[in-house]
Amino acid sequence: MPAQDVLTRKTGVIVGDDVKALFDYAKEHKFAIPAINVTSSSTVVAALEAARDNKSPIILQTSNGGAAYFAGKGVSNEGQNASIRGSIAAAHYIRSIAPAYGIPVVLHTDHCAKKLLPWFDGMLKADEEYFAKHGEPLFSSHMLDLSEETDEENIGLCVKYFTRMAKIHQWLEMEIGITGGEEDGVNNEGTSNDKLYTTPETVFSVHEALSKISPNFSIASAFGNVHGVYKIAAALKPELLGTFQDYAAKQLNKKAEDKPLYLVFHGGSGSSTKDFHTAIDFGVVKVNLDTDCQFAYLSGIRDYVLNKKDYLMTPVGNPTGEDSPNKKYYDPRVWVREGEKTMSKRITQALEIFRTKGALE
């Protein structure tokens, strides 16, 4: 049975119970869905093409900085103005174009630290306004990353926001524990390795608090994962995810194989296939992939410019003749497309590694 058979909406942006149904299907069939950070219509297209061509669902997400970029670097971000407008603009663009690709898309937003909560508030306001008109939120889901705060404050704020989100049937992703490296608004590059691991008890305390509100939430716990790519990384321990599931199952009087938690793998760039498979087998349903995609997008454009440099120095004049026009070489639709193709290729690799490929067949 293909994944689309469990969804009421087969293509385009899915919301509410469909998001849970997709994650349930992924957990049961032991695959994870790549979450691709998008910053422009071009990166959106690259991700959608890869998913369509590999018959896979996909998660598209905007970060705080990525959303501001989507709005335009010339727009002031005072009061999170650009980030709010950019994320909403991206959401409407993705909603309009995603059905053309014939695949289900989860529309998500990435890390929101406490200092960025005005951004979250602006998006949630847009969700509620959209819900009033259409009976569903604008975004499928949002992420709160309050891992810099105490666990008590982290969970308390998540409960506060999730109570509001549940009223519009929206999924919440939260982070507990510290993921190393740097991601929009959260910098943990100086964190010692021993702090990069969450305990089963802490993870379950999140489940205990949020499950009273709605089952529609996932947990990004720390198991040595790091944002970005570094020469020396922390010791990744995906087997810890199994202990989180086992502890939760025991507390809930369920079988260990039930894997009651929806888990998320942050800092996926640069990890091994073995680590991904171990994490997915323990209930990871979403893997964030940003840094690798950024480099892949650059590589296509970089290689094009290097290979065609003799055609890009002047509007007219190249090795074929001093009067030969170069417009077909410097047209942005040509060289930007090269970045889309290499980014799409990198996402295709992820779809294969995460076992997502063919999930819609």
Curated annotation (Swiss-Prot):
D-glyceraldehyde 3-phosphate binds at S63. One of its GO terms (cellular component) is cytosol. PROSITE patterns: ALDOLASE_CLASS_II_1, ALDOLASE_CLASS_II_2. Transmembrane segments: none annotated. Dihydroxyacetone phosphate binds at G228, G267, G268, S269, N288, L289, D290, T291. GO terms for biological process: gluconeogenesis; glycolytic process. The keyword Amino-acid biosynthesis does not apply. Pathway: Carbohydrate degradation; glycolysis; D-glyceraldehyde 3-phosphate and glycerone phosphate from D-glucose: step 4/4. One of its GO terms (molecular function) is fructose-bisphosphate aldolase activity. Binds 2 Zn(2+) ions per subunit. One is catalytic and the other provides a structural contribution. It is an enzyme of class 4 (lyase). It catalyses: beta-D-fructose 1,6-bisphosphate = D-glyceraldehyde 3-phosphate + dihydroxyacetone phosphate. Its EC number is 4.1.2.13. Pfam families: F_bP_aldolase. Its cofactor is Zn(2+). Zn(2+) 2 binds at D145, E175. InterPro entries: Aldolase_TIM (IPR013785), FBA_II (IPR000771), Fruct_bisP_bact (IPR006411). Homodimer. Belongs to the class II fructose-bisphosphate aldolase family. This is Fructose-bisphosphate aldolase. It comes from Kluyveromyces lactis (strain ATCC 8585 / CBS 2359 / DSM 70799 / NBRC 1267 / NRRL Y-1140 / WM37).
